[in-house]
């Protein structure tokens, strides 16, 4: 699972996701990509599940780039705890994804293989996505 090696602060505010992604919205490394169409938090488990599904489908051929990184800690309070007494402890990491953001890229394979592999990865995501081709 992906997570930062160290962070400046243990806990973060939730924040809000408004507007489009103004960075990371163009294909940089591969030829095919999976682009987000909705805003959401994507957990490190979901990112890893999508990556594994793509690599398993593509087998040896091709290369995969993961363009998002979970750098936001999500805290959860223990079960049956009364309100107050501070914020809960960090439980897992998420990546804040806005519409237009590239999630995965793929290269070195045919379009049919890439489309099928990326479609499998898209089914692991909690948001609507689209398959795009560079150029």
Curated annotation (Swiss-Prot):
GO cellular component terms attached to this protein's record: chloroplast; mitochondrial large ribosomal subunit
A Pfam family the protein falls into: Ribosomal_L16
Record-level GO BP terms: mitochondrial translation
Family annotation (InterPro entries): Ribosomal_uL16 (IPR047873), Ribosomal_uL16_bact-type (IPR000114), Ribosomal_uL16_CS (IPR020798), Ribosomal_uL16_dom (IPR016180), Ribosomal_uL16_sf (IPR036920)
A GO term, aspect molecular function: structural constituent of ribosome
Compartments in which it is found: Plastid, Chloroplast
Keyword set, alphabetical order: Chloroplast, Plastid, Ribonucleoprotein, Ribosomal protein
Residues making up the signal peptide according to the UniProt record: none
Subunit-level organization: Part of the 50S ribosomal subunit.
Similarity annotation: Belongs to the universal ribosomal protein uL16 family.
NCBIfam families: rplP_bact
Protein name (Swiss-Prot/TrEMBL): Large ribosomal subunit protein uL16c
Source organism of the structure: Acorus calamus var. americanus (American sweet flag)
